[in-house]
Amino acid sequence: VFTATAPDDSVSSMHIEELVARMPEVGRNLVTVYRRLRDATEELEAYRSHATTETSLPAERPMPFEEVRDFFYDRNNYIGELDIAAERMFAQSGMTVGGLDVQLSALMHERFGVRVVIDADLPAHAKRSYDPETKVLRIAQWLLLGQRAFQIATQLALVSQPELLSAIVATDDQLTPESRGVARIGLANYFAGAFLLPYREFHSAAAELHYDIDLLARRFEVGFETVCHRLSTLQRPQLRGVPFIFVRTDKAGNISKRQSATAFHFSRVGGSCPLWVVHDAFAQPGRIVTQVAQMPDGRSYFWLAKTTAPEGQGYLGQHKSFAIGLGCDLMHADKLVYSTGITLDDPSTAVPIGAGCKICNRSACAQRAFPYLGGRVAVNENTGSGLPYSPVTEVV
């Protein structure tokens, strides 16, 4: 399952999924084994990188944000008890879609004694500031209405669900103390998304609109990124949506956000694949670009990507630029409006991509930036090739 080059009699992904469904404990053990293999691979790369520099550096451990990403990945990016709690509070509080920033401000004051103030004097990049002593929540004036609602809903999670947040974090005894703090914020953000986009209503709208992100954003008064992230969480048993992979990357290929309800693998070393359509979005800012891509394991995915609109920080201010990517297994692509007019059943049209050059075994890739980690590059001074670091002849 985990080898770089699968033999002809390798177990199919369908069989693996069936095994996990029938025996969840086996599935968890497979995930654990795979994670250990991945960590060992990345540790080897770290040792190689340090071999020519400092030899006294302490052993690296996963960063808190990496641990929290694994925390959500292990749960298929769906936190059932928190999702249901947000949906229940939305309904019991008489909330309706539209103008949620105003409705949430009233809810915070009436139910929790928290006064929400729209503040123009917060630090330049601050979005939210809460004082537990005075129970005043300050929200940055420059935020859009949907962004204001999200920040208020995040604080709502922290003041209304502290025990639930702690209980969910406590289910993972592998988290470090620092990671636990990051996980609480991540769970509060999850609650906020689930509150603004209540599961059943949003799930129904997504199917009705064929997952048209712009139309969903307009209906629920939130941004493109918020809709994409919420779509990646629609994995409630008996009411699942399309299992999406959600990513956010910058022009240099650094992935700052990644969540997956699928088996799609992201590399932590050597950057992401330059052939991946998410990088093409920067060449067409504001437009949605699509791609049918195939991974080295043979699985094919449908991807769409779009750049985010920069926040108004003034002409001399520092502007953030990201591309949002949303992908799913090719078998689900026909449910998406973005697959209209695209050939989905011809494998020859799929773009061969990988998780990252250092862990990708495609020896015939002309775009390769690094040699395959653990492989040997054949060097023959009597020949020349247009393929960098080729061929990978064996794995050691």
What do these predicted ranges mean?
Residues 1-396:
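Short juxta-domain linker segments that transition from a proline/glycine-rich
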